Amino acid sequence: MTGALVVVDVQNGFCRPEGSVPRIGMGLAGAEAAVGNAAVAVRAAREAGTPVVFTRHLYRPGRADEGPNLYRGGELAGIDGLLAGTWDAEVVDDLGWTPADLTVDKCRFDAFLWTSLDPLLRGLGVDQLYVCGVVTNICVESTVRAAYMRDYRVTLLADACAAQTPRLHEAGVEVMGECGFATIASAADLGSALLGDRAVDVAAVPA
């Protein structure tokens, strides 16, 4: 099988205290740890030559693409949260993202819906996905379910994910694991699988 790492929405707007999502009262418990572990996974994948695909949840100016199901009744729109081209919408610096990276922008929870993610992965010959990111029980779970329904083998890197509360994170992980949508693992597990003994050295390198 050929694998790829899919990093879901690890953006300033979700993961930084001054981001738009925390500012409307939906901050993520354990975001800092999740970002750190996602960085470990990204470094391991890059070192192993495994494709890394980043997704970004964002909206165009004017937000015509946001649709009627607004975050918190429009609070996010009210502060221009996750607006394309802003700091809020960008991938956090810790992951070493650059414009040259494979990046899929989306405006719905499921990263496969109305995006180029599936043809991109098919074009890379990928049939195994390692998934991490935020929010565990929302965009990550929606994407994992969609991947499963498209016949990808999915591994969830649970310690590189975060949700609004630990309970919601744990519930999302439990559903994905117990329903068979994903095998549950950690960022360190990914490093070991891809790099063997070199995984420890990669994990120790600063982002």
Which residue stretches match the model-derived regions?
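Active-site-adjacent betaalpha module
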Residues: 1-4, 40-48, 65, 72-207
